Design a protein with these regions (language model features):
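Alpha/beta enzyme core
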Residues: 2-214, 218-237, 244, 251-254, ...
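Flexible C-terminal active-site loop/helix
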Residues: 259-308
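Shared catalytic-loop signature of beta/alpha-barrel
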Residues: 231-276
């Protein structure tokens, strides 16, 4: 589907609807290319990662340095070129309850089908880093109520994330999640469950739909979506796109630097380095046909023939 398709945007299914049919796996993305590749891999949903966005868009670590305007712009661009629903990490909501209301409305209007709001103090940091602090229990629930108010009627679900597991205790994390559900959250998310026993226990004791963030290279144990589904989690995120891209860029960057050529790329059977390969992922032929449908005379974009 082409850019800014209203029909496409309205036809995107919500997360609660998807979760009724089974556990939804939503890999993390950070730009239009990663989002398109997740969609074309066959996943039913995606999650815009705050940490990966900070690195790719601004070139900074995940310590609360991305602005709301920067985030909204990326949400708009990804929404315009994909057809699967997206969760958006809104960190701490960019302020108090009033700031949060504006944040939620702007992100929902930009095309998000879910947001996840955390209870860290500002400036926040990646949930898998030490040195986190969280706001008070009552303040967090107040922000959940404000976010729910802002999202009412938008079709955008509210995911209540807590970092209290590592900062305070598992019991406090469970309590915050249950109170968040009572305050209107649609889904809950305990960041960084460190053991399988705790993942199972939280799955049993937290009310309502639950999300699990799969990051086995971080604080969480190695598990599969099938496993956590059996433990009561209906939404699972994973971080493969950026880490795979980083590894490939490091590998081929070294080879190309040492050879002084792009031959390591062009001769690798796993890599299609043709420009048309990239552009076809984003609908170049459909774009050109669209231009001609209005009476234009735009030539199609076939590849140049290679001369030996």
């Amino acid at each position: 589907m082409l850019y800014d398709s209203y029909e496409k945007e309205h036809s995107k299914r919500g997360f609660l609807e998807l979760m009724e049919k089974g556990t939804v796996v939503a890999p993390c993305v950070y730009d239009c290319v990663s989002a398109k590749m997740v969609e074309q891999a066959g996943f039913p949903a995606m999650c815009l990662s705050g940490g990966e966005l900070a690195a790719s868009l601004v070139g900074v670590p995940d310590i609360g340095l991305v602005t709301l305007d920067e985030l909204v712009g990326v949400v708009e661009r990804i929404s315009s070129c994909t057809s699967i629903p997206m969760i958006v990490d809104i960190d701490t909501g960019f302020g108090n309850e009033l700031n949060l209301i504006r944040t939620c409305k702007r992100i929902a209007q930009a095309g998000a089908k879910a947001v996840h709001l955390e209870d860290q103090t500002f400036p926040k940091r990646c949930g898998h880093l030490q040195g986190k602090t969280v706001i008070g229990h009552d303040e967090y629930i107040s922000k959940i109520r404000a976010a729910k108010y802002a999202l009412e009627g938008s079709g955008c679900a509210l995911i209540a994330r807590t970092d209290a597991y590592h900062v305070i205790s598992k019991e406090e994390a469970i309590s915050r999640c249950n109170d968040a559900i009572d305050a209107g959250a649609d889904i809950t998310f305990i960041e960084g469950n460190a053991t399988i026993e705790d993942i199972i226990d939280c799955g049993k004791r937290v009310k309502g739909p639950k999300m699990f963030a799969m990051l086995s290279s971080g604080a969480s144990p190695k598990v599969t979506a099938e496993q956590v589904s059996g433990w009561g989690y209906r939404l699972v995120t994973m971080h493969y796109a950026m880490f795979a891209a980083l590894a490939a860029m490091e590998e081929f960057g070294k080879k190309c630097f040492e050879s002084g050529s792009d031959i390591p790329i062009t001769d690798d059977p796993k890599v299609d380095g043709r420009p048309i390969y990239l552009f076809e992922k984003f609908g170049i032929h459909e774009w050109l046909r669209l231009g001609n449908s209005f009476g234009g005379n735009i030539k199609d974009a076939d590849e140049l023939e290679k001369r030996e």
